Amino acid sequence: KACTTLMARLKIMANLDIAEKRLPQDGRIVYKQFNRKGIDVDLRVSTAPLNHGEGAVMRLLDKQKSTLPLTALGFSDQNLEMYRDLIKRPYGMILHCGPTGSGKSMTLYSALNEINDPGKCIRTAEDPIEYTLKGLLQMQMHRQIGLTFAAALRSFLRQDPDIILVGEIRDQETAQIAVEAALTGHMLFSTLHTNDAPGTISRLTEMEIEPFMISASLTCICAQRLLRRVCKTCGTVTEAEGREDEILQRAIDWSGPIPHAKEGGCPACRGIGYKGRVGIHELMPISEELVKGINGEYDTAKLKRIAVRNRMKTL
């Protein structure tokens, strides 16, 4: 009885349908000015029907980290310079791919902050809205009433924004409209669940998007992951031995001492040896050679070889 009451209260707070117990639901709870610093606390709520009743998971979003600069996200110098140039283009499509929790949303928000100015109209379609940013017009999806990513995109195209963010491309309809938006003078940002950058091309093809439309609309694809950061308080460094220096230099453009986590850690990292996370990125700008490969319907392995020849650093 207590669980049923608690679940009903949680659904009300997250603006979910308390009568719907057969389908998964996603919502959001916001506590305004939760602490003395006036920081808002944002919770993403997900419910699902399970064999012994409904289950709920709440994900705490760090509002203080909503405006991290691109320089703090772990981009290499080469990738950072390239990415900054790509996001400032007037039209095209930039896709971020990776599993859930790989930092895609954070990178997208940071990119929008980088290019945001009063002279640009930026619209976002999100499910749910993770962070509220100044200067952006953000739309919360409500699939129960038919407000989907595809419906939001159609609406945006009639309102002539400069930049569009779509939380995720989930189906063929959304993918088709996203491509059309990129081809009609808009810069579109979105995400896909694929393992690496070249694999995104295959995913779009599976969604029945014509190869020539993919190559014409895509600006770049960025695959990413989050790795644990060695604790700065107790971490140690060692010099590269043997061919380690050569291998690291060639693979990830790294030279110098190699950081190591201390076994047992320290109080600062709670005995783990790691504190915080840092992103790694696989940036694949669409070159003329890749355009030919996409139009020629090359497989993922061949597209990856072309991208590596064009100086893409793989994950």
Region spans (language model):
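Short, flexible helix-loop junctions that flank or precede catalytic/ligand sites
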Residues: 1-315
